[in-house]
Amino acid sequence: MAFFAYPGKESWISPKNAKLVELAKVSIDPEDALRRLADELDAPSLPANVQDETPTNFECGKLTRESAGIIISKLMPENAIVSDESGTSGGAAFRYSAGGPKHDWLMITGGAIGQGLPVAVGAAVACRDRKVIALQADGSGMYTVQALWTMARENLDILTIIMKNNSYGILNIELSRVGVTHPGPKALSLLDLSNPTLNW
Protein backbone atom coordinates (compact mmCIF):
# COMPACT_ATOMS: atom_id res chain seq x y z
CA MET A 1 0.00 0.00 0.00
CA ALA A 2 1.14 3.53 -0.71
CA PHE A 3 1.38 5.79 2.31
CA PHE A 4 -1.26 8.27 1.11
CA ALA A 5 -4.73 7.41 -0.15
CA TYR A 6 -5.06 9.97 -2.92
CA PRO A 7 -8.64 10.57 -4.13
CA GLY A 8 -9.28 8.61 -7.32
CA LYS A 9 -5.79 7.06 -7.36
CA GLU A 10 -4.73 3.48 -6.69
CA SER A 11 -3.12 2.83 -3.31
CA TRP A 12 -1.77 -0.63 -4.11
CA ILE A 13 1.84 -0.52 -5.28
CA SER A 14 1.91 -4.11 -6.57
CA PRO A 15 -0.05 -5.04 -9.70
CA LYS A 16 -3.59 -6.31 -9.05
CA ASN A 17 -2.74 -9.71 -10.56
CA ALA A 18 0.45 -10.16 -8.49
CA LYS A 19 0.57 -13.22 -6.24
CA LEU A 20 1.69 -12.19 -2.74
CA VAL A 21 3.60 -14.89 -0.86
CA GLU A 22 4.23 -14.79 2.88
CA LEU A 23 7.90 -15.57 3.50
CA ALA A 24 7.72 -16.12 7.26
CA LYS A 25 5.32 -15.83 10.17
CA VAL A 26 6.10 -13.44 13.04
CA SER A 27 7.24 -16.37 15.18
CA ILE A 28 9.88 -17.45 12.60
CA ASP A 29 13.45 -16.09 12.67
CA PRO A 30 13.45 -13.55 9.78
CA GLU A 31 17.22 -13.80 9.17
CA ASP A 32 16.96 -17.56 8.78
CA ALA A 33 14.01 -17.16 6.42
CA LEU A 34 15.96 -14.67 4.29
CA ARG A 35 19.03 -16.97 4.23
CA ARG A 36 16.91 -19.89 3.06
CA LEU A 37 15.27 -17.70 0.40
CA ALA A 38 18.72 -16.55 -0.80
CA ASP A 39 19.87 -20.19 -0.99
CA GLU A 40 16.75 -21.14 -2.94
CA LEU A 41 17.40 -18.31 -5.42
CA ASP A 42 21.19 -18.93 -5.59
CA ALA A 43 21.71 -15.34 -4.49
CA PRO A 44 25.30 -14.30 -3.69
CA SER A 45 26.25 -14.62 -0.02
CA LEU A 46 27.90 -11.19 0.02
CA PRO A 47 26.35 -7.93 -1.19
CA ALA A 48 27.61 -6.56 -4.47
CA ASN A 49 30.22 -3.82 -4.31
CA VAL A 50 28.63 -0.47 -5.02
CA GLN A 51 30.42 1.74 -7.50
CA ASP A 52 31.63 5.02 -6.04
CA GLU A 53 29.95 7.77 -8.07
CA THR A 54 31.53 10.66 -6.17
CA PRO A 55 33.31 13.05 -8.54
CA THR A 56 37.08 12.91 -8.04
CA ASN A 57 37.78 16.43 -9.31
CA PHE A 58 35.48 18.25 -6.89
CA GLU A 59 36.37 21.92 -6.40
CA CYS A 60 35.20 24.38 -3.78
CA GLY A 61 32.49 26.77 -4.83
CA LYS A 62 28.86 27.55 -4.19
CA LEU A 63 27.15 25.28 -1.67
CA THR A 64 24.34 23.44 -3.46
CA ARG A 65 22.41 20.23 -2.82
CA GLU A 66 24.84 18.45 -5.12
CA SER A 67 28.02 19.86 -3.57
CA ALA A 68 26.66 19.24 -0.06
CA GLY A 69 26.12 15.60 -1.00
CA ILE A 70 29.69 15.30 -2.24
CA ILE A 71 31.11 16.92 0.91
CA ILE A 72 29.05 14.68 3.20
CA SER A 73 30.09 11.53 1.33
CA LYS A 74 33.77 12.52 1.33
CA LEU A 75 33.91 13.39 5.06
CA MET A 76 31.62 10.69 6.46
CA PRO A 77 33.55 8.53 8.94
CA GLU A 78 33.55 4.72 8.87
CA ASN A 79 30.53 3.16 10.66
CA ALA A 80 28.56 6.41 10.73
CA ILE A 81 24.80 6.30 11.18
CA VAL A 82 22.87 8.74 8.99
CA SER A 83 19.36 9.81 9.97
CA ASP A 84 18.05 11.23 6.71
CA GLU A 85 15.00 13.47 6.68
CA SER A 86 16.46 15.88 4.17
CA GLY A 87 13.39 15.72 1.96
CA THR A 88 13.95 17.19 -1.47
CA SER A 89 17.50 18.36 -0.71
CA GLY A 90 19.45 15.25 0.27
CA GLY A 91 19.37 12.92 -2.72
CA ALA A 92 22.97 13.61 -3.69
CA ALA A 93 24.25 12.69 -0.21
CA PHE A 94 22.52 9.31 -0.40
CA ARG A 95 23.70 8.65 -3.96
CA TYR A 96 27.34 9.62 -3.43
CA SER A 97 27.77 7.94 -0.05
CA ALA A 98 26.72 4.55 -1.46
CA GLY A 99 30.31 3.82 -2.52
CA GLY A 100 31.90 5.46 0.53
CA PRO A 101 32.86 4.14 3.95
CA LYS A 102 30.64 1.50 5.56
CA HIS A 103 27.65 3.16 7.26
CA ASP A 104 23.97 2.73 8.10
CA TRP A 105 21.37 4.96 6.44
CA LEU A 106 18.04 5.46 8.22
CA MET A 107 15.39 7.24 6.18
CA ILE A 108 11.70 7.91 6.29
CA THR A 109 9.54 5.09 4.97
CA GLY A 110 6.11 6.70 5.10
CA GLY A 111 4.33 9.95 4.54
CA ALA A 112 4.88 11.59 7.93
CA ILE A 113 7.50 14.24 8.59
CA GLY A 114 9.34 15.18 11.76
CA GLN A 115 11.13 11.94 12.61
CA GLY A 116 14.69 12.78 11.50
CA LEU A 117 16.02 14.53 14.61
CA PRO A 118 14.45 12.09 17.13
CA VAL A 119 15.79 9.13 15.12
CA ALA A 120 19.27 10.68 15.32
CA VAL A 121 18.88 10.99 19.10
CA GLY A 122 17.84 7.34 19.36
CA ALA A 123 20.74 6.18 17.19
CA ALA A 124 23.27 8.18 19.22
CA VAL A 125 21.93 6.86 22.53
CA ALA A 126 21.92 3.27 21.24
CA CYS A 127 25.36 3.42 19.58
CA ARG A 128 27.52 5.82 21.58
CA ASP A 129 30.67 4.57 19.85
CA ARG A 130 29.45 5.65 16.40
CA LYS A 131 29.17 9.07 14.76
CA VAL A 132 25.59 10.05 13.92
CA ILE A 133 24.82 12.48 11.10
CA ALA A 134 21.35 14.05 10.98
CA LEU A 135 20.45 15.32 7.51
CA GLN A 136 17.39 17.42 8.21
CA ALA A 137 15.07 19.48 6.02
CA ASP A 138 14.16 22.84 7.52
CA GLY A 139 10.38 22.39 7.39
CA SER A 140 10.17 18.93 8.91
CA GLY A 141 12.83 19.90 11.44
CA MET A 142 10.37 22.35 12.99
CA TYR A 143 8.10 19.47 14.01
CA THR A 144 10.62 18.11 16.53
CA VAL A 145 13.07 20.95 17.10
CA GLN A 146 13.19 20.03 20.81
CA ALA A 147 15.42 17.09 19.81
CA LEU A 148 18.26 19.63 19.35
CA TRP A 149 17.97 20.45 23.06
CA THR A 150 18.12 16.74 23.91
CA MET A 151 21.24 16.31 21.76
CA ALA A 152 22.97 19.11 23.66
CA ARG A 153 21.72 18.07 27.10
CA GLU A 154 22.82 14.46 26.66
CA ASN A 155 26.10 15.47 24.97
CA LEU A 156 25.35 13.19 22.02
CA ASP A 157 27.83 12.78 19.17
CA ILE A 158 25.54 14.05 16.42
CA LEU A 159 26.41 16.28 13.50
CA THR A 160 23.18 18.00 12.44
CA ILE A 161 23.04 19.43 8.93
CA ILE A 162 19.96 21.53 8.15
CA MET A 163 19.03 21.59 4.46
CA LYS A 164 17.36 25.00 4.25
CA ASN A 165 15.23 25.84 1.22
CA ASN A 166 12.60 27.97 3.03
CA SER A 167 9.84 25.67 1.84
CA TYR A 168 7.94 22.51 2.60
CA GLY A 169 9.37 21.16 -0.66
CA ILE A 170 8.02 17.65 -0.21
CA LEU A 171 4.52 18.99 0.47
CA ASN A 172 4.67 21.03 -2.74
CA ILE A 173 5.30 17.74 -4.56
CA GLU A 174 2.39 16.07 -2.76
CA LEU A 175 0.14 18.98 -3.75
CA SER A 176 0.87 18.29 -7.41
CA ARG A 177 0.27 14.56 -6.89
CA VAL A 178 -3.32 15.22 -5.85
CA GLY A 179 -3.81 17.16 -9.07
CA VAL A 180 -3.41 20.75 -7.88
CA THR A 181 -1.57 22.30 -10.82
CA HIS A 182 -2.21 25.98 -10.08
CA PRO A 183 -2.40 26.47 -6.30
CA GLY A 184 -3.63 29.83 -5.11
CA PRO A 185 -1.65 32.32 -3.02
CA LYS A 186 -3.09 31.03 0.28
CA ALA A 187 -2.14 27.42 -0.49
CA LEU A 188 1.35 28.47 -1.55
CA SER A 189 1.81 30.59 1.57
CA LEU A 190 1.08 27.54 3.75
CA LEU A 191 4.09 25.77 2.23
CA ASP A 192 6.44 28.77 2.32
CA LEU A 193 8.83 29.16 5.26
CA SER A 194 10.15 32.64 4.52
CA ASN A 195 7.60 34.80 6.35
CA PRO A 196 9.10 34.90 8.89
CA THR A 197 12.29 33.17 7.84
CA LEU A 198 13.74 30.42 10.02
CA ASN A 199 17.10 31.37 11.49
CA TRP A 200 18.57 27.90 11.96
Predicted feature locations:
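Thiamine diphosphate
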Residues: 25-36, 92-200
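Phosphate/pyrophosphate-binding active-site segments
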Residues: 2-88, 186
